[in-house]
């Protein structure tokens, strides 16, 4: 499920900003004023690896601004890197959104997976008001999820970190002040069998978003672990994006949990 986009459908941004720890690449839709999707890859995954998923979103009629992030965000065992990464990416996203607006784009959504989901969780509301709808492809507690990655946990232990210290260091990122989210629409994609970011871990984070005015739902997918949960969400990305984009129509209530398990049978 890989391949390349044709000439003229993409524009590359090759320069990696060392202090920011990310790289971006733009994939153009056929129409200049098509909605734009901010797409952030999972931890340790490159844009080229997920070109197949990006291509599916482009074919559905969206510009895609894709990002990949440095593995140092976890492997360097320095919690400040995540904070700096989020700050740097916010600034870049604001710049890219401003540029796209000047080119005629008026709608902006997002699709973030795993670490990418958490970064975007810290970019909604007052942080970047233009992001009013989008998909969190897995979600939960960033410190607990990272601690479940054996290699990353060992690296942090070597540097004197414990889970409680990490939770304290990232508390303000885990519980951001959104401001008002009136009219915003978001969905979390998850699986009961995801051992890194389990479905049941999402519930505590729905309340603050709803209290801020957002419509938030949880979509359960059929998977056997964290990676397959991510892939299931990526495979269904065009349909899931349509669920949250205003004016696309949603057939079920937004207050509860939905399941895509039967619909995705036979796929990752």
What do these predicted ranges mean?
Residues 40-88:
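Cap/lid segment of the alpha/beta-hydrolase catalytic domain
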Residues 111-120:
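Gly/Ala-rich beta-loop-alpha elbow adjacent to hydrolase catalytic centers
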Residues 1-31:
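N-terminal cap/lid segment of alpha/beta-hydrolase-fold proteins
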Residues 210-268:
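C-terminal catalytic histidine-bearing segment of alpha/beta-hydrolase fold enzymes
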Residues 79-103:
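Alpha/beta-hydrolase active-site loop
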Residues 146-207:
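The feature captures the conserved acid-bearing segment of alpha/beta-hydrolase catalytic domains
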Residues 35-42, 190:
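The conserved beta1-alpha1 loop
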Residues 121-165:
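Hydrolase active-site cap/lid region
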């Amino acid at each position: 499920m890989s391949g390349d986009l044709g000439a003229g459908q993409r524009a590359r941004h090759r320069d990696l900003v060392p202090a920011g720890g990310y790289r971006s690449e733009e994939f153009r839709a056929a129409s200049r004023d098509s909605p734009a999707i901010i797409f952030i890859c999972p931890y340790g995954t490159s844009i080229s690896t997920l070109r197949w998923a990006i291509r599916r979103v482009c074919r559905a009629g969206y510009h895609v601004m894709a990002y990949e992030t440095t593995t140092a965000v976890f492997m360097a065992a320095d919690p400040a890197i995540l904070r700096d990464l989020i700050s740097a990416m916010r600034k870049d996203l604001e710049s890219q959104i401003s540029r796209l607006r000047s080119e005629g784009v008026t709608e902006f959504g997002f699709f973030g997976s795993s670490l990418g989901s958490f970064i975007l969780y810290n970019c909604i509301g007052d942080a970047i008001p233009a992001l009013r709808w989008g998909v969190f492809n897995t979600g939960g507690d960033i410190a607990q999820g990272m601690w479940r990655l054996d290699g990353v946990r060992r690296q942090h232990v070597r540097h004197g970190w414990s889970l409680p210290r990490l939770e304290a260091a990232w508390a303000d990122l885990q519980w951001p002040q959104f401001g008002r989210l009136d009219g915003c629409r978001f969905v979390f994609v998850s699986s009961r069998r995801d051992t890194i970011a389990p479905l049941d871990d999402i519930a505590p984070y729905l309340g603050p978003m709803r209290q801020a005015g957002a419509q938030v739902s949880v979509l359960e997918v059929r998977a056997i672990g964290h990676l397959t949960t991510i892939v299931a969400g990526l495979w269904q990305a065009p349909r899931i994006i349509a669920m949250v984009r205003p004016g696309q129509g949603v057939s079920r209530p937004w207050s509860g949990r939905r399941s895509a398990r039967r619909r995705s049978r036979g796929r990752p």
